[in-house]
Each structure stands twice: as C-alpha cells, then as structure tokens.
Amino acid sequence: MAAKDVKFHSDARERMLRGVDVLANAVKVTLGPKGRNVVIDKSFGAPRITKDGVTVAKEIELEDKFENMGAQMVREVASKTNDAAGDGTTTATVLTQAIVKEGAKAVASGMNPMDLKRGIDKAVEAIVEELKKNARKVTKNDEIAQVGTISANGDQEIGRFLAQAMEKVGNEGVITVEEAKTAETELEVVEGMQFDRGYLSPYFITNQEKMRVELDEPYLLIHEKKLASLQPLLPVLEAVVQSGKPLLIIAEDVEGEALATLVVNKLRGGLKVAAVKAPGFGDRRKAMLQDIAILTGGTAISEDLGIKLENVTLEMLGRAKKVVIEKENTTIVDGAGSKDEIQGRVNQIKAQIEETTSDYDREKLQERLAKLAGGVAVIRVGGATEVEVKERKDRVDDAMHATRAAVEEGLLPGGGVALLRAAKALDNVTGENEDQKVGISIVRRAIEAPIRQIAENAGAEGSIIVGRVREKPDFGYGWNAQTGEYGDLYQMGVIDPVKVVRAALQDAASVAGLLITTEAMVADRPKKETAPAMPAGAGMDF
C-alpha cells in the first residue's frame, strides 16, 4: 500500500480553504447578468466559452492533493444544486465560500466546530421557511418567459421559446434541447406518445408524398413476443376487417409469414394495417408496452397474463384518434385510455423516479412520464459557430430547469435580494450557547455574498448596494444589475425560482458544515519518478 500524507487541524483547514478559494473565485465571476465568461481549454477541438458555473467547476483539478479535496467538495455543491434545481450553481458556490471562510476563522479562534455547525443549520432552516413564506406562485406565461430569460443571461428568445414549450406540453412534459443544423433556434412540439421505432416495411406507407403511414382511429394490438406465423393472428385480423378500422401491431418483431401476409393484405386493400417493433429492451420494453396499453385503453398481450393471441378480442385492443409512423419513429395521438388509469400510472412512475438512485434510470422514467402526461417539446438551438451553439445550449439547459423549478415552488425577487431580505427571520433564532450564536451570525453575513458578487461583477460597490436595498423594507425592492436601477424586482422581471435559492443555500450549508468540522485529511503521497536503470551493455568500457 502506498504511503499517505496526513494533515491535521489548522494546517488541514488552511490547505482546504485554498482549494475552495481557487474553485470559487473561478466560478463566481460568472454570477449575475453582467457576469464574465470563462474560457476552458479542451484537449482536442476549440476552447469552450461558458457562463455556466457547474461547467467551470467540473473542469477544475488542482495539483496539491489537499487543496484539490477542498475544491472537489465545492464542486460537489455545484453538482448537487444542479441536479436538484438545474440552476443556482454559482450562487451555491459563492455561499459555500462565504460560510467556510467565516467558519474557519471561528474555529481558528477556538470555537467548537460542532456547535458552529448546529448554529448554521438552525439559521438555514429559518431562512428556508422565510423564503417559502414569501414565494409567489407562477401563473402567467410572461412570468415563465421572464424566469427563462434571466436564467439564460438575458436572452429573451430563449425565455420565449421555453414559455411556449411549457404551454404546449404542460409541467410534466419533457423538453429536450438539441443542437440545430442551422443558425436559427426553433421549437418543435410532438403531441401524444412518440417512440423511436418506425414501420417494419415500406409497403405499409399510406402517404407517399411524406413517406409515412397514417392510420385514422386505428385499433392497436400490443404484443410482447415475436410474431412469425400467421395462424394465431387470424381471429383478430378477421374481427378488425369486419369493423372496417385500420390496425397497428406493436410487437417485439413481426417477421416471416406473418409480415408477408400483412403486406399482401395491405397492398390488395383488404386490410389497412401496419406493424412496428416495440420500443425499449428487456424489462423497460415490458413497462413501455404497458404504458401504451394504458394510454390507448387496451391490454398488453403477454404470456405472463395467460392470454393467448388466438383468444384476443376487439375489446382487448387499444384505440387512438390517429397514429403516424415514419421511418424511425411512431406517434400515437389521443389514446382512448381512461384519465384515472393514466393518472394512476403517472403517479406510479413518479414514485419510481423518487426511489431510483441511477441517473440513467431517472432520465428514462422521466421520458416515460412525459409521454404519458403531456408530450415532448424539442428546442433546437442554433448559432453561427459550433462554440456559440454549445454556449447557448448550456444556457437553454439552465433556463429550462429554472422555469420548471419556478412552476413547482414559486418565485422570489432575484439578484440575491431574496436571501438578503430573509435574514430578518434570524432575529427570532437563538443559539443554545455562544458558539451556536456565532454559527447563526456566520449565515447572516454569508447570505449577503451573492448580491455583493452580482454588484461586483457589474462594476458596482457591493456594500453601497446592500445598504440601499436594506433601506426599504418591501420584500420585492432591490437593485437590477442589468440596468443599474433600484425598484420592484417583480415588475422589472428580475426573479428567481424558490427551489433554486433554497437548494443553493441548503447544499452550500451542508458541505460548508462538513468542511468546518474537518480535523484531519489523508491523501496519497506524490510518487517520486525514479530514473530507469541503464540498459545492459550500455557501459563505457570497450
């Protein structure tokens, strides 16, 4: 086992603090509407320019192992806030730095770190309650657009697109962000359920011009296994022919005799039919077929249920208003499933999202949720160069999460003002001893850090701004860094989602508390590079 370096007490905290400062100083220049850009060198390709705090944080790796530990802990704050709220990463970093700095001073002067942490936790709890109490609910489309615009650093086009997307697909719908092939940014909305499987044979096409299959008011046969022979299918095909409606078959695969017969029937005009492969793989495929069955009011035919294909009746088939099948995807519009059953399935998927620990699983579950609940909106981000597109895409991602968070928990005045105002909640919080009281006052000072940093990035003096804002007791009154004016921030459209501010403060306090209570640090010793031995026969004697 390699030898380790161990640092104790103030030496450990000092090294750690240096790492915290390096990372936080690089991230905090991006805060606010007049935040600066950070250029990141890439091992291949052009450098990346970004104003996204978490992107900067993820790129920083320090040579000194102990300093790096401090930096990585702050990076963890940025990542956690990003996961929870999708925005507010820079605010969280600024708050962490402020709490750790003050906390380290208090510990160095002989205070009990555990009591300091208890004081910090009490203060944070009180502030979070105050923030929730003063939240405004989001009702109008304009407000959603404003949140998006602010999070996208004042880009109104992004705010507008996000508001439109949320209006179309609802709060549960999925909004995906892609890079456009052109310089224009555009929005495309897919209503209904779409999955990434196309028609199994081009002979099924009904609309030659658009090269796609269009089925009006079809029946849907949802089958878990492969269909190869025709015999089991005959009873259901005959029933569908008599009803005069089209039929869509969704199965693991349709091949051989079954596929050939379906194609011949379609070409002769006896039966309007199409077949697609089932989406997903393994257990996920089963779940998705069940989703389609619930959405269309049908039954997923599987051997687990003991239903044989020969015994399937029309009542077991799903119904939809329309189905459109293209080469690579299928869209089911307006399924005939009952609202209650769909809602029950939605709640079930939400519970799974809460429980899962895997990011990949969570993403897939959210996709399923969206397909059931509303639809999918795709924002294609355009730009003149690849660097610009990537930078804009970062901002659209941030803005999208911020608008979601705003709809979920409501809005607060932005620009760091909400935290500053919430400090009055600390007047009623008392510590059990002197050290806890110091912990509370550390938070009181730290929550000024975001507004000071926003002012500094905009070229103003933080202390003067804080003083002027405090003069007026109105919760929404503050300073607009974009215009340099004072006034009602709600009216000016300078707003932050409660969830973002809350997550930033809670995550910052959590990690800062851990850093303050650290007494020892252990890291691998740097390996000494030994010179390679001289190869045999390379001596100097002839």
From Swiss-Prot:
It is found in: Cytoplasm. Its main location: cytoplasm. Gene3D superfamilies: GroEL, GroEL-like equatorial domain, TCP-1-like chaperonin intermediate domain. ATP binds at residues 30-33, 51, 87-91, 415, 496. Keywords: ATP-binding, Chaperone, Cytoplasm, Isomerase, Nucleotide-binding. One of its GO terms (cellular component) is cytoplasm. Belongs to the chaperonin (HSP60) family. This is Chaperonin GroEL 2. It comes from Chelativorans sp. (strain BNC1). The lineage of its organism: Bacteria, Pseudomonadati, Pseudomonadota, Alphaproteobacteria, Hyphomicrobiales. The gene is groEL2.
